[in-house]
A protein has these predicted regions:
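Phosphate/diphosphate-binding loops
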Residues: 353, 364-366, 372-373, 411-433, ...
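Extended redox/cofactor-interaction regions of prokaryotic respiratory oxidoreductases
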Residues: 66-79, 84, 161-380, 484-727
Length: 839
């Protein structure tokens, strides 16, 4: 727990600063990035290394050496440039001094008057002081779309922490990203990943997957040196982002799928043949070079992703950054890609990722999409499995916008050949089981698992970064490389396992976030509620999961958020870690268990659970970190507290030990095309912004008549009156937007609400209707992601270091696009490409 007590249990007062208790001051060097030149953003020129004085204490270590130590608080204030009387330069006595960190300094970069910044900051802090922290920041995902998104977020969090707002009702951090909060998470996971029958699951971070498998890495323009700290050793980071991602996979920081350059079933067989465990065999084969990670050679045919199922995602019409790269390299179809790869440009190639001169086009053999409408992804698919819509199926719905569990209730049968999602996957499982006979039996599968957050080995590399392939350490599964686990796959019985609740919940219980509790009572109840399987075989007498409602009941009964008895057990499990009793947070609802029929009658409010850091209480509105502050539950971090400072070696190397201003990166996508292929109209360069969809929900229903009427009936892009005037563009003109990543053809919406310098396209406007051809590509105009490309940030690859460790949908690489720019010009000819298709 985080009680203020010493090791003997005595009350103590923790020292925040050494301002009045020090052995002198030391000059500390801080990296500065605000002076980085950018064609479209204003720099503030200062030395790229700033020295500031910090108070220190001298500590004598066991070996007799003396070290100077400082508190994080003192280092933080020095980072902000606050003059506290310790002498030295690069500090400010008032807000008007032009020193990095002051309101005057930021005014040069942002154009926001310093008086406005000072006013808002004072009002925010004053409100927090008067109300005990009831100042709140509500933020959407827009800030998360910049390359240095984590620096943006850390800036907000720092302000909240310093004002005492975190974990206070009515204050703190309210992050909104849409209908994305999976509240009954621990009930859903066994069902979603088959954890009731076999563990661990094979999971992957999507951003790295598509970066490699759609060959976006071959076109990388951002040099790692461009974002490295001036205090770092550049020779240690001579590699590319692709290389660093492969290193992260090799050290167990990030997952990989495909994993190795051999079939994992064959690896298990080979290990058995030589009498070794799979772990020993894989380690030995990796060391002698007979085996390698798939991502070290992503263009080798044996490492292609051959089949892909897309469900609950419009990958090719909405979410997939680097759309044209996916069309070319993943699908092997027509594309609008204009850029040259590293080989064609004669640029430096990756050091650890094998380069093949001939880039593959069409890695996928099979693309299957489940959707209830013919979206862009469905149009590109080999097979489309029509799914039921909201009123044709039974399902669960939760959100971060309210604390209720909602049902989707089947009012009518699915139309025509469509089926519910559950029935489709149930049918796939049945067909696979039938086809497996004589081909695949009970097989052993070798699964590589990264070093996961909230597990005992999450602190696998506490004393720096060691790469076994470079000879810096031995390859030790679960410590210096991924954990290697053999999992049994019973293919002929896949259907029986899919339609029943497996025995691992009886034997191992359930849990989440590092906690675990017994679930035998819940399994027994589900056997009575859903009835038990009567057929002979592996699932005999197990609780049945035949229908979508059966599946919903499993989720509801296993999750502490919807079963009070489980919630009490979960809080008790947490108490075993903290040494404090937390069961009072749920004991009043111990006999409350939400059934599917309950939420059909009325949406039900969830129960407080230790899976989340806020409370669902009649007197406390949900607030992130409320239980950390009021129940003294440690944050799941290296220190157990909120951290201003991150001391991981890569964080330091990239200048992100502390939060600081990082300007947008230069994606270098404009120069190769600007004024090079003119159509006679003026070309201008604008910042590419893609807000949340205006006339629909993500990619749903934006193509019906009502929505199209509201949005002018086809793709539209918004730009300012000033920019439109300078380029001779009038409202409703057809314009083209392009860079080396691809091109878009759309109509212009000229608006005074848009700031000069930016151009805005609401996301998920698909290319399925009223989309003419692009003049520059000769193919149909693209979607909002046609002009973007995935650019990985190395610090998002860190693992094995407490909170800096991979977790499914928690931490890993992410795609960004706000740093991107496009060339905008008026179109001369609008070609609808209506000529007959020739084969």
């Amino acid at each position: 727990n985080i009680e203020e007590k010493d090791s003997a249990g005595r009350e103590t007062k923790l020292r925040l600063s050494l301002q009045d208790f020090n052995d002198g001051v030391a000059a500390v060097s801080y990296p500065y990035f605000g002076g980085v030149e950018h064609a479209h953003f204003t720099p503030a020129k200062f030395s790229d290394i700033l020295e500031r004085n910090v108070p220190v204490k001298q500590l004598t270590l066991a070996d007799g050496k003396t070290w100077a130590v400082a508190t994080v608080y003192d280092l933080l204030l020095a980072q902000y440039g606050v003059d506290r009387g310790f002498g030295g330069g690069n500090v400010a006595k008032n807000y008007d001094e032009d020193v990095p960190g002051t309101p005057a300094w930021q005014e040069k970069i942002t154009g926001v008057p310093r008086a406005a910044v000072i006013g808002v900051a004072r009002e925010f802090a004053d409100t927090a002081a008067k109300t005990r922290g009831r100042s709140m920041i509500i933020v959407g995902a827009g800030m998360n779309h910049w390359f240095h998104n984590d620096m943006n977020y850390r800036g907000l969090i720092n302000m909240l922490v310093m004002c005492g707002c975190v974990g206070q009702t009515g204050g703190g951090w309210a992050h909104y990203v849409g209908q994305e909060k999976l509240r009954p998470q621990t009930g859903w996971q066994p069902l979603a990943f088959g954890l009731d029958w076999s563990k661990p699951p094979r999971q992957m971070n999507g951003t790295s997957f598509f970066y490699f498998m759609s060959d976006q890495w071959r076109y990388e323009k951002l040099d790692v040196q461009d974002i490295l700290s001036p205090l770092a050793d550049p020779e240690k980071f001579s590699a590319s982002q692709a290389d660093l991602n492969v290193q992260a996979i090799r050290m167990g920081w990030l997952p990989s799928a495909p994993q190795l350059n051999r079939n994992p079933l064959h690896i298990a067989q080979a290990a058995e043949a030589v009498g070794k465990s799979a772990a020993d065999y894989v380690v030995n084969e990796l060391k002698n070079g007979a085996l390698d990670f798939a991502y070290a050679d992503p263009d080798a045919p044996e490492n292609f992703p051959r089949a892909m199922f897309i469900w609950r995602s419009n990958l090719l019409g909405s979410s997939g950054k680097g759309h044209e790269y996916m069309l070319r390299h993943l699908l092997g179809t027509r594309h609008g890609l204009q850029g040259k790869d590293l080989g064609e440009r004669g640029a430096q190639k990756p050091e650890e990722v094998r380069w093949r001169d001939e880039a593959p086009e069409g890695k996928l053999d099979l693309l299957v999409t489940l959707d209830f409408r013919m979206c862009t992804t469905a149009l590109y698919s080999d097979i489309v499995l029509p799914t039921a819509t909201w009123y044709e199926k039974d399902d669960l719905n939760t959100s971060d916008m309210h604390p209720f569990i909602h049902p989707l209730s089947k009012a009518v049968d699915p139309a025509w050949e469509s089926r519910s999602d559950w029935d489709i996957f149930k049918g796939v499982a049945k067909t696979v089981s039938e086809m497996a006979e004589g081909v695949l039996g009970v097989e052993k599968d070798v699964v590589l698992v990264p070093i996961l957050h909230d597990t005992p080995n999450e602190l696998a590399m506490p004393l720096g970064v060691s790469d076994w392939k470079k000879g810096e350490c031995e390859p030790i599964p679960g410590k210096t490389m991924p954990t290697i686990v053999t999992v049994e796959r019973d293919y002929p019985n896949l259907y029986k396992k899919f339609t029943s609740l497996g025995p691992l919940l009886d034997a191992q219980g359930n849990g989440g976030k590092g906690m675990n509790w017994n679930t035998q009572d819940e399994v027994n109840f589900l056997g009575k509620l859903n009835h038990r399987v009567l057929d002979a075989g592996v699932s005999s007498n197990r609780p049945r999961i035949d229908s979508a409602i059966d599946a919903a009941e499993v989720i509801l009964h296993l999750a502490p958020e919807t079963n009070g008895h489980v919630a009490v057990k979960a809080w008790k499990s947490l108490g075993e870690f903290t040494g404090r009793d937390h069961t009072h947070l749920a004991v009043g609802k111990a006999h409350e268990a939400i059934r599917f029929r309950d939420i059909q009658a009325q949406p039900r409010k969830i129960i407080s659970s230790p899976i989340w850091s806020g409370l669902e209480d009649e007197h406390v509105s949900y607030n992130a970190c409320y239980t950390n502050v009021h129940e003294l539950i440690p944050w799941r971090t290296l220190t157990g507290r909120q951290q201003f400072y991150q001391d991981h070696a890569w964080m330091i190397a990239f200048g992100e030990g502390f939060m600081q201003y990082r300007p947008p990166v230069d994606t270098k996508t404009i120069a190769p095309l600007l004024n090079k292929r003119s159509n006679g109209n003026k070309e201008m360069v604008l910042n590419w912004i893609t807000p949340h969809q205006k006339w629909g929900i993500h990619s749903t229903y934006s193509d019906n008549l009502l929505m199209q009427t509201l949005s002018r009936g086809g793709p539209i892009v918004w730009l300012s009156e000033d920019d439109a005037r300078s380029a001779g563009i009038e409202d409703n003109d057809w314009i083209e937007l392009f860079n080396v990543n691809g091109a878009i053809a759309a109509r212009a919406v000229v608006s005074q609400r848009v700031m000069p310098g930016m151009v805005m396209m609401y996301h998920a406007q698909e290319r399925i209707l009223n989309t003419p051809g692009s003049e520059i590509t000769g193919t149909r105009g693209g979607i909002h992601n046609s002009v973007t490309r995935v650019v990985l940030k190395p610090t998002h690859m860190i693992g094995g270091y407490a909170q800096l460790a991979y977790g499914f949908n928690y931490y890993g690489t992410c795609g960004t696009n706000r740093d991107e720019f496009v060339i905008v010009r008026k179109m001369n000819k609008v070609d609808w490409l209506e000529q007959e298709t020739t084969r």
